[in-house]
């Protein structure tokens, strides 16, 4: 069965979430990323795409670039822009795009489930991209980009999500592309760990 665990997240202070929020690192090229961070000192792209802070002639895979991602994450935390959970948590994340609504559980998955094929793969990945993100994780000591997993409908998990989404939100804002983002902190993180133990497999959708 699938192993899901709560975790201590590093997340934006509530009043800074819009300033930090950024698109995934791999949906734009470097020039587009440079444009996106202009006038935005707290954009998360300064952590996920730190090459934007270097001259265009600088090697984007240089040691200094990866070091900058670590330095910027530390700066965001030191300046209070981002906070660290004191206790392990599970989050519920909802995106609303026009008439389309999707809701997910934000938690940690286990590497053993990937190795033992309880997390199902659907495509090959490029080694250069794997190496880049692996080094980024090692340098920052953080997973800065989530993996999107799907699982078959489960009534127990649905009930937990329904209960948590009736509570107060942690974040509720709309990004420049018109997508509404809503996040709740679960009041029963252990219940998700127990519920996912009955899920036979997850499927990689993206990440």
Enumerate the predicted regions with their spans.
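A cross-family signal for N-terminal binding/gating loops and helix N-caps
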Residues: 1-206
């Amino acid at each position: 069965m699938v192993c899901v665990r709560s975790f201590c997240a590093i997340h934006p202070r509530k009043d800074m979430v819009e300033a930090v929020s950024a698109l995934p690192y791999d949906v734009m090229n470097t020039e587009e990323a440079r444009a996106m961070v202009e006038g935005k000192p707290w954009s998360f792209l300064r952590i996920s795409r730190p090459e934007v802070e270097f001259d265009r002639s600088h090697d984007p895979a240089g040691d200094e670039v990866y070091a900058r991602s670590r330095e910027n994450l530390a700066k965001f935390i030191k300046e209070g822009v981002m906070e660290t959970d004191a206790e392990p948590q599970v989050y519920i994340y909802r995106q609303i795009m026009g008439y389309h609504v999707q809701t997910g559980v934000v938690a940690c998955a286990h590497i053993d489930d990937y190795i033992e094929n309880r997390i199902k793969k659907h495509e090959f990945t490029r080694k250069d991209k794997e190496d880049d993100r692996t080094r980024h994780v090692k340098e920052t000591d953080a997973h800065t980009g989530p993996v999107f997993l799907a699982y078959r409908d489960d009534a127990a998990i649905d009930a937990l999500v329904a209960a948590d989404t009736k509570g107060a939100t942690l974040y509720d804002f709309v990004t420049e592309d018109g997508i509404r983002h809503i996040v709740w902190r679960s009041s029963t993180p252990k219940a998700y760990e127990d519920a996912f133990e009955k899920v036979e497999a997850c499927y990689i959708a993206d990440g």
